[in-house]
Curated annotation (Swiss-Prot):
Molecular function as annotated in GO: DNA binding; DNA-binding transcription factor activity
The keyword DNA damage belongs to this UniProt entry's keyword annotation: no
Residue ranges: DNA binding: 17-56
Biological source species: Brevibacillus brevis (strain 47 / JCM 6285 / NBRC 100599)
The gene coding this protein: rex
Function statement: Modulates transcription in response to changes in cellular NADH/NAD(+) redox state.
Subunit structure: Homodimer.
Name of the featured protein: Redox-sensing transcriptional repressor Rex
SMART domains: CoA_binding
SUPFAM superfamilies reported for this sequence: NAD(P)-binding Rossmann-fold domains, Winged helix' DNA-binding domain
Length: 207
């Protein structure tokens, strides 16, 4: 974890935003881009962009900017997206279905490789071509498929128990959609995607 702690989480969270924009530039055949152009389109201070990228190396040329293809390649390497990353999803409800189907649509190298649910009526059925398995098969499947990331979309009361099972199986990163706080060891990174809380904070700005 030491090498990761040198880079702030805020920087790491901005890298995928840069990557998404740069990937768009590739699609429209733009070959170079300046930090000013990136900042204007992403609403991020250009100096912050330069500082973020400089934390990982010297990727730009003064007066020219960044080579789009090269920067995409480097950011993907930094985020460890050059190889296939397998993800487990726990909770095959409406949200779990939506995430699985969207992931299949993306056709990216980060793919959902296993889906689990404790409802016997769902087990054996497929979502985006992936069979839903019982939670009793979670640890064995995660180990066998070498899955390191997981998504939790279960109800709040079940989230911590699921988190415990995932970390016991060797999961190193969890994206939690359950509207509750979960805890794991220091070697497990947890991110939250609480739609309700985000909407509530937006409501504050209503006039």
């Amino acid at each position: 974890m030491a090498k990761h702690e040198k880079i702030s989480e805020a920087v790491v969270r901005r890298l995928p935003i840069y990557l998404r924009y740069l990937s768009y530039l590739q699609q429209v055949e733009v070959t170079t881009v300046s930090s000013q152009q990136m900042g204007k389109n992403l609403d991020v201070n250009p100096a912050q962009i330069r500082k973020d990228l400089a934390a990982f190396g010297d990727f730009g040329k003064k007066g020219i900017g960044y080579d789009v293809d090269y920067l995409v390649e480097k950011i993907r390497e930094i985020l460890k997206l050059t190889d296939e990353i397998r993800v487990a999803l726990v909770g095959a409800g409406h949200l779990g279905h939506a995430i699985s189907n969207y992931n299949a649509y993306l056709k990216d190298n980060m793919r959902i490789a296993a889906i689990f649910d404790n409802n016997p009526e769902k087990q054996g059925k497929k979502v985006a071509g992936i069979p839903i398995q019982p939670l009793s098969e979670l640890e064995e499947t995660i180990v066998n498929k070498q899955i390191k990331l997981a998504i939790i979309t279960v109800p709040a009361p079940a989230a911590q128990s699921v988190c415990d099972q995932l970390t016991q199986a060797g999961i190193k990163g969890i994206l939690n959609f359950a509207p509750t706080t979960i805890r794991a060891g220091k070697d497990v990174r947890i991110h939250y995607a609480d739609v309700t809380s985000n909407l509530q904070s937006l409501a504050y700005y209503l006039t």
